[in-house]
């Protein structure tokens, strides 16, 4: 079970870093284009040398962020390949899947818990152990009752004296044949309370197993509740991040127009660009967090993680 969760988490981490790399590459290209534009404006006296320096610094910062994003992607890919026990990560890549988020209503915790009771191996194993303890009690109680046993035996012997051949080997086996049959009735009147102690021990074991099962169920329910609330929070965060991206895209568009018309400084333009970049990164993080949280709920419902 842990392997499935770990692989899913590692896989989504790779996709997360893949998208961050694309955002970083896009922002780097945008910074380069803007830097070229400011240099041209400076050449005709419409931009200061300070703005040119700021633009070049912005390009350098974005290039560094791109390198870091690509390194994070490669490290995440390495972690996944090692988790899958691939001989080498060389040539190991992932195709970009369709990660469009469809907000289906989340299954209620109680319903997930009901499904989990029938498919979680830990719960099933605890239930089987508890059922087996009832048989152990009956076996221990059987010593309270009289026991009738049956036995049978058959045997023969052969002997010889030096120089005597009066009786052959075959005749001796036949003549000396002994047969026996018997019954034994055991009535447990007093056995130093051994039977009672064995029954008590079996009942105590049953009580302990029942407590273990109950505790396992409680832990499972708490885990499901926590997973459900985490999914709800992740959904809310993703919705908020999408709204933030929409707002920052519009803000950046307006700031770009103002900067092009000379009504905004490069610092103001760069701040709007940074806000947009951050909101895009937050959205990507929120998306994959939501996807992971919903996969956890599927895991508790016994669904294959796909």
Regions picked out by a protein language model, each given a short descriptive name:
Residues 6, 17, 58, 143, ...:
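Outer-membrane beta-barrel pore domains and translocons
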Residues 25-26, 50, 54, 124-128, ...:
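Sec/SRP-type N-terminal targeting helices
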Residues 16, 61-86, 245-303:
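Short segments within alpha-helical structural elements
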Residues 129-132, 136:
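Long hydrophobic segments that form regular secondary structure
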Residues 95-106, 138, 151-187:
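Small/polar, glycine/serine/threonine/aspartate-rich low-complexity segments that form flexible
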Residues 1-13, 148, 152, 193-196:
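Short flexible linkers and secondary-structure junctions
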Residues 2-115, 230, 234, 276:
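Periplasmic alpha-helical coiled-coil/stalk elements that build and connect Gram-negative outer-membrane
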Residues 49, 159-163, 194:
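Outer-membrane beta-barrel proteins
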């Amino acid at each position: 079970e842990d392997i499935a969760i770990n692989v899913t988490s590692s896989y989504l981490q790779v996709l997360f870093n893949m998208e961050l790399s694309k955002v970083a590459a896009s922002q780097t290209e945008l910074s380069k284009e803007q830097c070229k534009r400011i240099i041209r404006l400076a050449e005709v006296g419409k931009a200061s040398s300070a703005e040119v320096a700021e633009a070049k610094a912005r390009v350098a910062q974005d290039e560094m962020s791109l390198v870091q994003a690509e390194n994070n992607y490669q490290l995440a890919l390495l972690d996944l390949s090692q988790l899958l026990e691939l001989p080498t990560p060389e040539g190991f890549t992932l195709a970009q899947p369709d990660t469009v988020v469809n907000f289906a209503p989340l299954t209620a915790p109680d319903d997930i818990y009901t499904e989990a009771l029938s498919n979680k191996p830990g719960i099933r194993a605890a239930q089987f152990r508890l059922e087996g303890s009832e048989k152990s009690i009956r076996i221990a109680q059987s010593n309270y009752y009289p026991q009738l046993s049956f036995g049978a035996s058959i045997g023969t012997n052969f002997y010889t004296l030096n120089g005597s051949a009066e009786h052959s080997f075959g005749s001796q086996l036949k003549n000396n044949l002994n047969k026996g049959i018997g019954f034994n009735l055991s009535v447990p009147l007093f056995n130093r309370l051994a039977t009672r102690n064995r029954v008590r021990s079996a009942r105590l074991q049953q009580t302990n197993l029942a407590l273990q099962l109950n505790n396992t169920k409680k832990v499972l329910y708490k885990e499901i509740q926590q997973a459900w609330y985490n999914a709800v929070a992740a959904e809310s965060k993703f919705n908020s991040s999408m709204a933030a991206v929409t707002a920052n895209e519009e803000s950046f568009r307006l700031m770009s127009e103002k900067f092009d018309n000379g009504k905004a400084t490069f610092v103001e333009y760069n701040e709007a660009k940074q806000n947009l970049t951050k909101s895009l990164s937050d959205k990507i993080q929120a998306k994959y967090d939501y996807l992971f949280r919903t996969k956890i709920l599927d895991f508790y419902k016994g669904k294959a993680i796909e």
